[in-house]
Amino acid sequence: MVLLKRWLRVIAIIGLIATILAPTTAQAASKTVSKVPARAAYVMDANSGQVLYQQNADKRYPIASLSKLLTVYLTVKAINEGKLSWDEEVTMPSNLLKLSHSYAYSSLQMKAGEKFTVKQLVAAAMIASSNSAATELGEIVAGNNAKFIALMNQQSEDWGLEAHFISSSGLDNSDLKDFDLVLPDTGKNEQNLVSAKAITKVAQQLLKADPDITKIASQTEASINGTKIFNENSCLPGKSQYKKDSGIDGLKTGYTENAKLCFTATYTVNGQRMVATILGGDTTFSAMNKLIKQLKQKYSLETTPLTAQRIALANGLATTVTATPMASQAGVWYQDKTTSLETKVETKLTPAQLSSGTVNVGDPVAQATVTDTQTGTAQQITYRADQTATLFAERVVFTAKSTTDQLLTALKQPVASLF
């Protein structure tokens, strides 16, 4: 009996230890990120560029309609540069009308003579993934299809991306041949080939160029000239794969037989805008939800607030300007440690500002660098001027009769104004 009691006591102790250790074991397991069941994946903080996950991230793969992200970026860039307006109206050429009526490649049928604004075409490309809309955007921006594809490849090269484009829509040459959209000197089955890292960075640049693009991409349906269009992003609210904890509000889906399912998602965690891409999967939406959940369990965010402040426009000069940061906070992701952040704000004037001697409202004037002192990971946030300022005062001419007060006043001015 005594021996039995001892054994029961041992068993009870073992059970108690197991109970105590169980949560720790579960917590450790929850911080593991499973391999994504797809060809490639990439996740980054859109504000800082910090990478949270990558899988075959630099290898080029077909990306289908994710290609439209670069098409829309270049459209927004042209608008921001004043070369194009959201309200500009166009009618569709005959080959794109034909494409819009193709059962296999169309999500929005268009009529001869029907007018579309640039904003409507962007909505059609982002929400319904309209191939005709995307192709027309390219022709509006560059003048014709071939010139726009060249612009896409030049932009990719400028950003150092692993990418090569032959279409603005994401369709392959085998699809484009019936619509007079195949570029000269390209193969009959050639297609856009882009890495997961590359298209994620394109999405990052699009968010910077137009932070409101998610207001378009998050719409599950919309109406264009009385025709309803629908979003294939199943992770949006009200859709079959929607998960509140994921918080996905965009951005673009894609599918061709060669590319399989592709998805670039946008979501926010603790105020930080995130971008995640999965290429070439069969269950991309559920895989994206799982990836986001696991990354939230693995990483924590250390943030520091950023507020408006006076920025000295040059070292040692009295000229200052009030500037506002482009984000209310900066943050660094970390795991299994306590981090320490250091913030440094530096004046950053452009050659054009220095040449003209003027800073205008909205101009970038400084850059905050928030650094994790333990890992060196850093995030940079731009400060933009809230007011106009003159860098250089009127030139001062010294004579033998210059008074002491005049000399002292001049010494308080920028050095460049003294000569």
Regions found by a protein language model. Give the residues of each.
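Sec-dependent N-terminal signal peptides of Gram-positive bacterial secreted proteins and lipoproteins
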Residues: 2-28, 419
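Structural motif marking the loop-to-transmembrane transition
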Residues: 4-8, 63, 114, 118, ...
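Residue-level preference for short coil/turn positions at secondary-structure junctions
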Residues: 12, 37, 361-364
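A short hydrophobic/aromatic micro-motif that marks alpha-helical segments and, especially, helix-coil
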Residues: 20, 83, 145, 224-225
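Active-site-adjacent loops and short helices of periplasmic peptidoglycan-processing enzymes
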Residues: 26-197, 207
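Domain-terminus/edge residues, biased toward the C-terminal soluble/receptor-binding domains
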Residues: 187-419
